[in-house]
């Protein structure tokens, strides 16, 4: 079998001659491959044995030999690329092709559905791995979506209309202002085999009391089998949605004893985790799922950090049969990138500094400094939601004279954060301000556990927005620390549905604590033979409802 090295050398010859027959000499070919005449003769013999080309040598000084290509170099390159992809070896793939843009297209062309022994498989390309899939811990946008595929909660939130629906509980009722009752389905099983018990539900809900949004849960009991009572310390009109939010997923009560649970979680959802490594997340349809069995048998999400700068964070690449990926769906996100000025900073605690930064670092100014690659995906934001226009259009103010150094903090494994921070640095440098870029892990960022003048942040909201917007921001310790406010008054108003969210958000923008930057276009790319794909506000879709039309694609 020809070696990969020989394949690569043939591809270089084929590219040099553009696949056309040529009259040439050993020396000319040796120059192309940067080797000796003796070695090129050996290579040509091996390529000829492999059936890739025909070499008709002519002897005599000045005579030129005939080179005919029998194999298409592009096809051979695609074959080698697929071998490297199967090995998750993108680094060698980049070396093979020599251009990351080309590699990106090649990779996307290989992400296709496959039918193995009657199984319907979907492959997805993503820019980073998912080491933490534990509900109740700090989760990023994509992890929140995946948690919903692996776990269930008492209720679930309809992604389209934002209404609470039956999930583990088939009915529920509010018995009093502080007492709710949920009626659970029988015969529900976890992925590792055992049946769901009421003790699992009680342990999961009591575990949540350490989280700010769930701190008002006073106790959880089961008066009779398959009935759960939740008692609150204060009324919460949002409880039926709160119990269906990503943090409130039900775990087996022994979850802490299960090996590597955060990476290999066990739930009751439509998909179970089979493998979760630095290269790939593999989830398989759970045949004992209590609801409709998923139509896609297996989903493999490949992680390609080597191509991170060529993959937009909010574009999800599904299977595709060509390099020209069809856009299955696209939308502007509910949420945005924004800057948070830190109340703990002696510099950004000052109104004049915050106001100057907001006048300088406008969305339009940042877009003018970014690559066209990102301009296509970013839209100026003037409020946390697309329909809000809270940022005031003010002329650029004079820099406070004592400001010469600033620090911005962002979380790692997010190349668009890195890109935005580089733009911020370039703009501030022109103003005579040195910007230090501090990159931390996600937990440190989420909790605001480091010193910084301001932070680069993002928030993605889901339906209903009047629930998720405050819930998402309130459960982010970083926001409270930057505002210097524990929001205890606001959360009580919100639970009673008496808080005007738009007025509250406008206030923190007006005071220049929060500065909106960009809304992001979310996009799904793949074959149109895929059905049942409805993009949610996180840019993903419900795997269990998707299917392939075998007569198309």
From Swiss-Prot:
Which UniProt keywords are present, listed alphabetically? Activator, DNA-binding, Repressor, Transcription, Transcription regulation
Source taxonomy: Bacteria, Pseudomonadati, Pseudomonadota, Gammaproteobacteria, Enterobacterales
**Name of the protein in question:** HTH-type transcriptional regulator SgrR
Xref: NCBIfam families: PRK13626.1
DNA-binding region at which residues?
A: 26-49
Which GO MF terms does the UniProt record name? DNA binding; peptide transmembrane transporter activity
- Start and end residues of each stretch annotated as Solute-binding: 163-494
Where the record annotates domain HTH marR-type, the positions are 1-117
Q: Name one GO biological process term.
A: peptide transport
Report the record's disulfide bonds: none
Q: What does this protein do?
A: Activates the small RNA gene sgrS under glucose-phosphate stress conditions as well as yfdZ. Represses its own transcription under both stress and non-stress conditions. Might act as a sensor of the intracellular accumulation of phosphoglucose by binding these molecules in its C-terminal solute-binding domain.
Gene field: sgrR
């Amino acid at each position: 079998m020809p070696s990969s090295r020989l394949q690569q050398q043939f591809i270089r010859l084929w590219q040099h001659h553009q696949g056309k027959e040529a009259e040439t000499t050993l020396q000319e070919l040796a120059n192309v491959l940067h080797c000796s005449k003796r070695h090129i003769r050996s290579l040509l013999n091996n390529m000829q044995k492999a059936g890739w080309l025909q070499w008709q040598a002519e002897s005599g000084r000045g005579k030129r030999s005939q080179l005919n290509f029998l194999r298409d170099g592009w096809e051979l390159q695609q074959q080698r690329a697929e071998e490297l992809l199967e090995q998750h070896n993108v680094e060698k793939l980049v070396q093979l092709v020599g251009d990351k843009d080309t590699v990106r297209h090649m990779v996307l062309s290989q992400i296709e559905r496959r039918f193995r022994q009657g199984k319907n498989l979907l492959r997805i390309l993503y820019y980073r791995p998912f080491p933490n899939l534990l509900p109740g811990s700090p989760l990023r946008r994509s992890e929140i979506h995946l948690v919903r595929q692996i776990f269930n909660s008492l209720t679930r939130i309809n992604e389209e209309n934002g209404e609470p629906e039956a999930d583990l509980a088939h009915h529920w009722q509010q018995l009093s202002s502080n007492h709710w009752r949920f009626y659970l389905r029988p015969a529900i099983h976890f992925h590792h085999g055992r049946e769901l018990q009421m003790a699992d539900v009680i342990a999961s809900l009591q575990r949540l009391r350490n989280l700010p949004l769930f701190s008002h849960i006073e106790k959880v009991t089961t008066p009779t089998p398959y009935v759960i009572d939740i008692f609150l310390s204060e009324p919460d009109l949002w409880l039926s949605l709160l119990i269906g939010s990503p943090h409130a997923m039900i775990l087996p009560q022994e979850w802490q004893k299960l090996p590597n649970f955060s990476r290999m979680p066990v739930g009751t959802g439509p998909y179970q985790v089979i493998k979760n490594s630095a290269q790939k997340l593999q989830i398989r349809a759970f045949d004992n799922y209590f609801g409709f069995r998923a139509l896609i048998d297996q989903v493999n999400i490949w992680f390609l950090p080597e191509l991170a700068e060529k993959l937009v964070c909010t574009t999800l690449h599904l299977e595709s049969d060509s390099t020209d990926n069809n856009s299955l769906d696209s939308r502007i996100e509910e949420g945005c990138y924004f800057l948070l000025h830190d109340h703990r900073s002696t510099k950004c605690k000052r109104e004049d500094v915050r106001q100057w930064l907001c006048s300088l670092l406008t969305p339009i100014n940042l877009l003018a400094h970014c690559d066209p690659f990102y301009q296509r995906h970013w839209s100026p934001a003037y409020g946390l939601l697309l329909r809000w226009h809270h940022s005031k259009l003010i002329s650029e103010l004079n820099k406070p004279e004592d400001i010469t150094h600033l620090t911005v903090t962002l979380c790692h494994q997010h190349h668009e954060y890195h890109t935005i921070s580089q733009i911020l640095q370039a703009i501030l440098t022109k103003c005579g301000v040195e910007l230090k870029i501090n990159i931390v892990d996600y937990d440190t960022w989420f909790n605001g556990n480091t010193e910084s003048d301001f932070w680069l942040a993002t928030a993605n909201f889901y339906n209903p927005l009047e629930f998720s917007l405050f819930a998402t921001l309130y459960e982010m310790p970083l926001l409270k620390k930057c505002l210097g406010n524990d929001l205890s008054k606001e959360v009580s108003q919100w639970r009673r549905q008496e808080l005007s969210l738009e007025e509250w958000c406008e206030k923190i923008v007006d005071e220049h604590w929060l500065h909106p930057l960009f809304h992001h276009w979310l996009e799904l790319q793949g074959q149109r033979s895929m059905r049942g794909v409805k993009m949610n506000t996180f840019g993903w879709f419900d795997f269990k409802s998707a299917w392939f039309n075998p007569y198309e694609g």
